[in-house]
Structure formats: C-alpha cells, structure tokens
Amino acid sequence: MASTTTSTSSLSSRRQKTGVGSFTINEQIGKGSFATVYRGTHMPSGNLVAIKSVNLSRLNKKLKDNLYVEIEILKSLYHPHIVALIDCRESASHIHLMMEYCELGDLSYFIKKRDRLADNPTLYDMVQKYPMPVEGGLNQVVVRHFFKQLSSAMEFLRERDFVHRDVKPQNLLLIPSPEWIAKRAKGGPEAMKASKESVVAMVGINSLPMLKLADFGFARSLPSTSLAETLCGSPLYMAPEILRYEKYDARADLWSIGTVLYEMMTGRPPFKAINHVQLLQKIEKNQDEIRFPSRGIYSRDLKDIVRRLLKKKPEDRITFPEYFAHPVVTEPIPGLVGDDRPKEKSPETSIVRQPSLRDRQRESPTVKHIDTAYESLITRDIGEQSPRTPNIESNQPFGTPGRSSGRPDSRDRPSPVSAATAPNVDTLPRQRDRKDRTEPNYAPIVRTGSTKQRYDEQANLQPKNEVQSSNSITEAEQDVRDAREYVLVEKKAVEVNAFADEMAANPRLGRANSAPKQLPRRHTSMGEPNSTTGAVAVPPSRIVQRASGRAQPDTSSARNSYGSYGKTGSSPSTASAIAKALQGASVRVFGVSWSPTLIGKGPSPPQLYNPYPAYPTPNAGLIGDGRPIDEDQRVVNIIEDSATRSDVVYGFAEVKYRQLIPLAPSMNHGLGGPNPERTGDAMDEDDGLTVEAIVNLSEEALVLYVKSLSLLSKSMDIAGAWWSRKQRGGIVSGGHTPGSDSSSAAQAGNRINGAVQWVRTRFNEVLEKAELVRLKLVEAQKRLPEDHPGHPNNRSTASRLVGGSSTTDGVVLSSGITAEKLMYDRALEMSRTAAINELANEDLPGCEISYTTAIRMLEAVLENDEELIPRKRSSSLREDKEKSEGGEVNGINFGDRKDVLKVLQMIRTRLQVLKKKMTAIAKHQSMPPPSSSPRRSYSGGTTPTINNTPPK
C-alpha cells in the first residue's frame, strides 16, 4: 500500500513538471474510464486550459479509433456552446488534447451543489436574481437558459449529421457568464479562448453561465437515414433502443436531451437503476407516462417537451425540426428580472388575456352566466420558474405553471393550478394564439371581451415610431383600464345578489323562509386560532358596498343574517355527520379553535364561519323513480356538494387569513372588550412575520379564496340553470303538480333557495376577504428588497393587474403556488395523520373528521369548472382526456388526476373501515356487562386468570 502511494505521488509530481509543447500539466481535475483531465497552463500567456491525457496502452483498436474520431470532430467544430479543441499532441504513450478550460465544472455538480452556488463569486448575482428551489432542480429561468444553449449546440451538430451518443450532465461543462468574463479583474489567470466568439453566447442570457457540450468520444457522423448498433453512452441517459441493442439513429440523442432537461428541472434523472437491464425494464413499464415530483413547480411547456422527448419508441419522439422549433427553444425566456430583461420594448404592448374560466354561455330570464370576475383579483407573473417563481404547473400531481411566452401554462405553483386559481402558469387557458408569444416578460392580464377589443385597437393603431411616447403614457392607460375593470368586480357581486334576491322573493319558495328579500351581508373575519370568539365584524370593502347598493348592516344583523336559513334547512338535531365533520375540521385539522365554553350552549353560539348546513336525508319517494322530481333532487345534491367543497376550501383559506391579518384588538380577549395597551389597525400588524412570509401567506390565501369563489360560482351557475328551466315550466313559479310531487318539488325548491342564499352570503364574504388579502399582498410586495424578483419595480407594466385599488400597483403572483397543490398536500397530510391515529386506536372521531375533510378537498381538486352537471368520475376522466389538450382539466393533466383519484379512493376506503370499527366499538360498549358468577369471573378476556380457575 505504501509503495503504491509513493508511486502515485511521484507520478503526480513528475506529471506536474511535465511540459507538452507550450503547455504545462498541473493538478488533476477529473478522471474517466480511459482518460485523465488535468488543469494546464499555456506558458507564453499564463492562460488556463484543460488537458485531456489518454493513455494509449489502455486502449484497444476500437477505442483508439473513437479517440481519433473525437479529435477529427473537434477540429471541425467551432461553436460557442461546444468545448473547443485548442491543440493536440501525441507521444509514444499518450495523446494530449488541449481544450477550453471550464472553471465552473460540469452540470451534474452544478445541480448537486445548487444550495451552495452563492458561495462562488461568479454565481452570486445569478443566485440573488434567480434563487434555486429548496427541493428539486434549478430555477426554471436557469433551466431554460441552459436548455437553449444545449439545443443550439445540438442543432449545430445535426446540420453536420453528427450524433453525440453520450449527452449527459457530466458532459455539459460551464464557464462564467460573458458579463463576468468581461469585467473580471485583470492580473489573475484566465481561461484560454479558442477564439473571441467562444465566450459570446449565441442564445440565452449574458448574465448567466455559459454551457458547452463536451466529450465527443462516442460521437460519429450519422446521416438521418443511417443506423448504428454500437452500445455507447452512459446507461442512465441511454435511449431505450440502445439499451435493447437495437439499431438506432440520431433520435437517440433526443432521449438523452430529455433526461438532461428532466434532471435540471427535478434534480434527479427520470429513471434510475443499478444496471441497464433494470433501467430498460423501468422505462418499458412506465409506458411513456413521465411523472414530475408533486412538490415541484414546473411550467407546462417544459413538461410538454420533456414528455415528447422521452418516448420509448424513436418514431414517437418529437422530430429534430419540431424540437428546434419548440417554444421553449425559440421563444424568449420568461421571468427575467433587472438588466436581463430586453432593453427595448415593442411599440405594441403584448398582453395575455385570460378568458372566463367557463366559456359556456348560459342565460336565464333573470341572470346571465355569472362571469368569474374575481379572476381580476389575481394574475400570474411569468417570472422565475422556481418554487417561488411563476410558472409555474404548480405539479401542484398537479402539479401547474403554457403561456404565451413559452412559460408554464400557469402555468404554475402546481401547478398544480386550475383555471379557477389563475395564478399557476400551467393552468392558464390553452387557447392562446401563438402570436401572443412575443413579449419575454409579461404576465397574463384578466380582461373582458369589450376591454380587450378596445385595447387591441389602440395597440394596433399605435405608430411604430412612438416607442418612447408609448412608455410615457402607459401608466395613464393602465389607470383607465383599471377603472373599467373595477366595475366588473362589482357587476359579478351584483349578479350573484340579484339572482339570490329573486329566488328569495318567489312566493312559493319564500313561504318556508323567514328571511327578508334582501338578506344582509355578513362581513366577518374568522377568529384567530386561540381566540375565544368566532365571527367579528370587519370594515366592509368598497366592492361589497357598491355591489350591494345600500348601506352596510350593523354587526348584530350581519352575524344573524344566515340564521334563518340554517333553521329552514334543518333543525340542529338533524345535522348530518358531514356537517359536524366540516365544523370540527377547522378546529382539529386546520388548527383553528374557539372557546369550549361557547360550544353546545345557547341557541346560536358564535362560529368561526357559517359552515354549509346539512339537510335531512331525502325520503325514499325522491329516489330513483325517473320523474322530474328526481332531477330536482339531483340538482339539489350537486349544488350542496359543490357548496360543501367550497366550505372546506374556505376553511383552509381562513387559516392563512388569520395568520396574515391579526384580529382586531377586541378579539384578543374574547368577549371581555379591548385591551387598552393595544392600539393600531390590524392591517398594520404583521405579528412578527417577515415580508417574504407575508407575501407567501397572501398568495396562498388568495389562490384558496379564488378556488372557493370558483366553486361558489359553479353552485350559483347550476342553480341559475335550474331556475331558468323551472320558470319556463312554471313548476316553481305557480304551476301545479299532483299531490306528493308538488310537495317534493316545493321541498327541493326550498332547499335550492336556501343553498343560493348561503352561497350569496359566502360569496360576498370571500370576495371581501380576497380584496383584503390582495391589498396586503400589494403592500408586502412593495416592502420587498428592490433587487428581489417579486418587487414591483422588477415587473413590467403589462404584468400588473389592479383589482380595486386606486393606485396602478397591481397584483402579480410571483410564485408557482396553486390552490390545487395546497389542497392536495393538505389532504395527504391529514389522511396520513388520521391513518396513524387510527392504527393506534387514538381519537377515532377525529380521524373521521380528518378523512372526511381530506375527501372533500380532493373532490374540490377534481372539480371541473367547465362542467355544470358532473358526470360519473370514470366517464368524466375518460372524456376529459379526449376533449382537452394534453388531457388537462383545470390545468391538471390526466395522469395527475388519476393519481388524485387513487388517493381519494384509498381515503374513502379507510373512512369506511373506520366507520365499521367505530360501529363495532359502539355496539360492544352498549352491550350489558356479563352477569357475575359465584364460581367463575373473567377479567374481560376469554382466558381466565389463575384465581378464577374453578376447582376440580
């Protein structure tokens, strides 16, 4: 062992003193199967090179041929994103290749050390602008940058009919950014350049590191029509046809490119195995279903190209022309900040407009289709594609981030995100024209059709030579557009309330209701987690004031505004288990509680919020007889189910809301009055939260409120369609039906009316709280450091959206957060905790609450906003896959929906098992104790103790 060490040391020492031509060989920096790489110095200039030293004695004839092929290829290739060959020297025992020195190492090291990149001074600015995600791979801006440069190199190779055959992160080397190289302090050692153009990026961003493709040892000239059959490359990145020992062509490189892109996005290869046989089995078993980690945020267009590259059959893969023309390759990188953004703006302002979440046009005599005007509360910045960047497809099984700039079709967060939660790039509507994909740094702006037409006309008429003047009047135009859009938010609330008022005023429906025609709005904020009280009055926003068209009710009337409906639907004794579960979920699962002394006593104890009331089980006459009454009952069930799901989402949002906006001072001491030592507005109290934490909470609360609004809006849409049919048929408005049918129809009508009143009240409350959260988010974004990507100064005017503020500072969600991803993660967390407690036989009623709430959350995730009357789940999934692009519904692709369904079914199964267990326990406890015997007594089991054994 000692002799070996001495020999190695002396060899290294001799190597350091060895000169090869005008170069000296220094320390070793890498080692492969057949070659060792050293850092070298060009003696005349002192510049650094990488010297690849190959020991010829270790090579057979075929490997020598490969080496000479590599040399010939490198001599003919001059491209900024391909490592250049500077010189080549051959001796009797070695061949030395002097190549460009890439001081940042390879891409695999870059990915593994992403959390420490800021320690390198050449990368510090990059990390500050585009922070790396806590989990997963690289920031999506960096991913797109590297992918563009790799694609540029591959396109150069394809033009010359070369196939690399060993594309992998270890063969993708990095050098500092051109900007850094240009301003590097003189005097220190520099990397030797093959030419001036070798450090000028052809694509990408000048402030980010440059990527160079290296190691052409397995490369060869292979025209498109030719096939090879040599097993080459690294197994983890090999194409399946190579692993199968089949003939292959240049399309094998497409697979390797897809694996590299996947690893950049997620931090790990798409398939891992201990040998190539198992690797091939995994690829075959996967059936081209490429999954992305659920905790990551990935843009839709990036996921699209990965899935098109990673097809196990070469003929199914994207072609090279399609690959080079893909939006991720050709379009500007979204999410740039600071000086990375283009300096010149197009005279025509590019605006991505998000259409209504439901394009279906349904009209009733009373109310036309209720537009989702709350969409104007939020938008998604196409900025950075990191966990804290826009999509982003959220994925999140969600999830998800395409958009008009090639960014994730919001995208996200998640991803997953549904169109109902607008923030995620992967969830933005897919019906966008390719011509919109021109501006590299803007976010979708919610506009109505009329506003869109007016603004498009203005943009099209703008002269080309008015670039400067257009920038100077942008703010004024934004003010005008914002003023117009602000009315639309009120219009949404007005339509909701108008429809609810008409139903409440109907004589037949109103008989059973004691509520007034104009139900007063309930403006409350939910009690904080440790509060001893429930609903508290908060100042009403202008949105609700204008929408209602009247003065706001006082606190007492607001608190009891829904009490009559709760009594109409059912008495407290008829509350179902699900209603109790939903009410208890906010306490046990979401961590929100109220004083135990206020529960179970008094006619109407204060509550955190009005949970959706339960109804008595319908009688048997309403089930399955095929008459119109059956349809009424079905509509009732659908409306109530959707309202219940919205209630669960609302409860989750309230947790975020209470962390974000502290209670008024009077609430901190229950009903005992305010604390004289505490003063100030609750909106100004951050309760110790950092600015970034406030931004995060605001975004999460906002997307959850918007999801709740979408479910409430859907309930109202269904009720509106039912109301229109009934008015045409005269059933509710005064028509006569025989006997019990008339009674059943009236009962169904009353239940729908009650649901509509509840939805109206909740809608107004959620809309107001969403506005408060929006204001909080805008305020927090202004307080971020000026160099932070989320700061308003780092966003273009086109990416701003105003939803009711008097200023021009709009709301931009700068992260990939989606409601679906938040809900999915929360449901998993609750079900896992419940499963652990169930196995331990601890708190079984609490387990039932957790299971039930998780089920409702996952059902809300799967809710299809484009579908009024839901179909059966299996049919819905199948038809949704066929009709939607990429099999996506609300931004959640078909594969992710299947995953959610599997989890949902498992939780339902656990809930059924739990109920059986609880029933058995209750039955056992209700049994009378066994009668005592003078001769024998048992200790509760079937095995008698020694003292109880009868004498023989």
From Swiss-Prot:
GO terms for MF: ATP binding; protein serine kinase activity; protein serine/threonine kinase activity
For the protein in the UniProt heading, the enzyme class is transferase
Q: Where would you say this protein principally sits, based on its record?
A: cytoplasm
* Lipid bilayer topology: Peripheral membrane protein
Primary gene name: atg1
- Which Gene Ontology CC terms are recorded? Atg1/ULK1 kinase complex; autophagosome membrane; cytosol; phagophore; phagophore assembly site membrane; vacuole-isolation membrane contact site
- The active site is formed by 166
According to the entry, every stretch annotated as the Protein kinase domain falls at: 23-329
Compositional bias, Polar residues, is annotated for 386-398, 459-475, 553-573, 793-806
Q: Where is this region: Disordered?
A: 331-478, 510-573, 783-806, 920-952
Q: What is this protein called?
A: Serine/threonine-protein kinase atg1
